[in-house]
Amino acid sequence: MITRFAPSPTGYLHVGNVRTALICWLYVRKQKGKFLLRFDDTDTQRSQEEYIKEIENDLKWLNMNWDASFRQSSRFDRYEDVFQYLLKEGFLYPCYESKEELEFKRKMKLKSGLPPIYDRSALNLTQAEKDKYFGRAPYFRFKINQDQLINWDDEIRGKVSFNPKNISDPIIRRVDGTYTYMLPSVIDDMDFNVTHVIRGEDHISNTAVQIQMLDALKAKVPMFAHLSLLYSDDNKISKRVGGSSVKDMQLYELEPMAINSYFAKIGTSHPIDVHINMLGLINSFDITAFSQAPTKFNIDDILKLNPKILHNMSFDDVKDRLKELKIDKPAFWDFVCGNIEKFSDIEEWIKICSRDMVPVVKQDDKDFITLALNMFPQGEVHDSTWNTWVSNIKQQTDRRGKNLFAPLRLALTGLAAGPELAKLLPLIGREEIVRRLSYSVTQ
């Protein structure tokens, strides 16, 4: 099995791209197949090297690797060879209308209540009419066979039957000699033996045309799966919608696996479970579970998954990131992971565990904190120190529950809520504990 993800490097990856890439990746990895990364950069005016690098970096950040990659701009000679073959065999034909003439035809069709389908007038030009266009470079269309329905078994939509009379003969090559999406995509799928194509439902008419192109080239037709489109606030998600790029999600400080856990299940009947690695998503993936209904995207739903991902990560999962913060103690991660919503929240806990932390004590609690300081156990501070300390305090005071724990937490962390204090004490050590308690009662 071979599938491909084919972004255009004319901008950053957005959520629609991410979902398509992820589903392609999970699908082929579950079948032990190959994942190709193809850059559709035939639009040389808008394609940029910067975006190619950013797309590669974003996929790596999202834990999606690829087995091979290539750029369509490196294959223009191959496209030209196939173009000449199709032209010779009568599958392509030249057209001479200007953009203004085509737009006029489109408006007249709509005004007459007809679908704006190309009238194939270029097919019926006499030699005399062609001579009038002498000196004007043609563009080329693929001649669709309108005599039979185009059928395929879609892995999401089931049996699909498409009437070719409902679409225009697609433009294959522009006046300037550059290629549109259609033909290069077909040639690449043929040459790289792509067996499965997964993409959005907005490509269904493209699929119908490309099946005929593959037939014209006597090539094997791959399996197709067309995903429903993503919507947000009743608007189709696109590159132009603010807040929808991978870069935007990184600014939200979303974890890659929160994003992946969400997009692997959104649009299915399955619950969205958090997975801290890709293997769990691979094992639970089922392409037939995806619905044909439009799929609502809400970044707030990913935000809710983010803390769950962090809470379930082990020290080994984050040790490289912690190392950048000069933290090498698994006990620290065990202490904070259940109380952060985004990874950068760790910085607050680093401060709390350092000598920079300023204790807080209420006036009414000063005597109690003095007592607690005197009751603190002797010897090395370890995991059981907290329970021993609290037991000692209870023997000397009638404080219980919140009245006992809240003043200690404020004095030791400056916060009204947070992780277990039993885990904090070994991290800050006896000297710092005594300093904080002493500071609290002397201010």
From Swiss-Prot:
Keywords: Aminoacyl-tRNA synthetase, ATP-binding, Cytoplasm, Ligase, Nucleotide-binding, Protein biosynthesis. Disulfide bonds: none annotated. One of its GO terms (molecular function) is tRNA binding. GO terms for cellular component: cytoplasm. Monomer. Catalyzes the attachment of glutamate to tRNA(Glu) in a two-step reaction: glutamate is first activated by ATP to form Glu-AMP and then transferred to the acceptor end of tRNA(Glu). This is Glutamate--tRNA ligase 2. It comes from Ehrlichia canis (strain Jake). The gene is gltX2.
